[in-house]
Amino acid sequence: MLIPTQIKSLRQYFYPCLGGILGGISVSTHFWLIFMPISLFILWKGSERRIANFCWGFFFILISHSWLYDLHPLTWLGFSWLASLIIAILILLFCAFLGGILVYLWGLLVEIILWKEDVFKMKILSLTVKVFFLSLTWGIGELILSQTPFFWIGLGESLIPGDIYLAGLARWIGASGLCVLQILIGFWIFYIQGRWERKLYFKKIFLLGLLVFIFLHLFGGLTTPIKRNYEYPVAIWQTNIPTREKLKINDEFIEEKLSIAQKYALSNKAKLLVAPEGTLSNNFYFSKGIKVNTLSGGFRNSNNELRSSLLGFQIGDKSFTSFIDKNRLVPIGEKIPRFLDIFSRGLSAVGGIQPGSDSRFFDPKFTPPLAVAICYEISDGLEIRKAINSGAKLIITAANLDPYPTKLYNQFLSLARLRSIENKKDNLLVSNTGPSGLVKDDGKIIQLLELNVEQNKIVFPNFSSDKTFYTKFGDKPILFLFILFMGLNLFWKIN
């Protein structure tokens, strides 16, 4: 039988783990509205205990990134079944451990700034300054991480489809601002519960917070719709060719399939055909000239280096005449350290590829200017924003998401929808096994193809020059607030 001290000790471990699990489950799901606030409440409640912070971060990443396990089996790349299983599990555990360490470090900052005295006896002004600074620190942390290849999705991008109205604030504050808001909401719940538990007055704080919460949703839901037109029909080709089968497919097969897609595009008077990432092999050459302007994922050589690119073909072309190379590569999966080149080609079918320019602006001349995200690059909102500031009128996202499960598809869709909201731009999606379709400039889905089915479809994207507050100013307001609140914490004696 457990004694009371053992039960208390178990609770100290159990609740942070539960909080991380609930948060991980809520990412890019309809559970967000219930699970994420509870998860962040648990995070704040245990934030004075270092191991609690680590446990929360570890399980948050373990659950939200559990799709990494679906790398297994890698037997098609020459690994044994056991080696494949070990590799997949180790990659997932490493990412979870890294998440735990990052939340642990944030918890140390919370301990230094917040837990030197009783939070529930602090003056409101002092408490507000401290909590805003800690929340902004998390938001800035995600912003910095998003500029590295080790970031996929964080709190900032997690709330679609769970709360599309709160996500609407992204047109003002971006993903990092949404992240800050979520941390603040978690603290508000923690603070109310703590005051209630201590039999302290809390109704005014509860009502004020509730009014702010409602206002944020109303403000996030406000949008000026852009009149839709049907002047630029685009054909999208969801190939449904799994990555593991690409090694068995020759160029003649792809050319035949692409010919069918072109006929479909022409019969529907499409001005452009778009195909997913990695559709065309290196130096692909058509035996006959292309019949419709085409953007297709594929590979090309540059200075004896292999690049994954979106290749542009004008009518009559037999080989590409324009391109934009993928810049953000999946560590180990696509990009391996040069000193390991002789030992491995990485965990991909094509071997290690090299990155291109970091600019996501692409003007193939036969379409209006575009902001292009190739798969993993959809997580980099800063570069997409820069491309739109350079004149891009539409976001095109080409991806290759097989063999991963629906969880990754949902996260990819959540990221794509947030990029649309941030910049008030339609986002045309085309993936080998899905998701493919069209996302409206307010993040709502206009059309989405069925997963894991080969399909050709006509969509009508809007090309728009409109810019949001976030597009114009980016994360500068969040950085300004971070510096302001850091200064207040360091130099202003507010207790």
Model-derived features: where do they sit?
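Soluble catalytic domains of enzymes that build or remodel membrane lipids, polysaccharides, and related
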Residues: 222-473
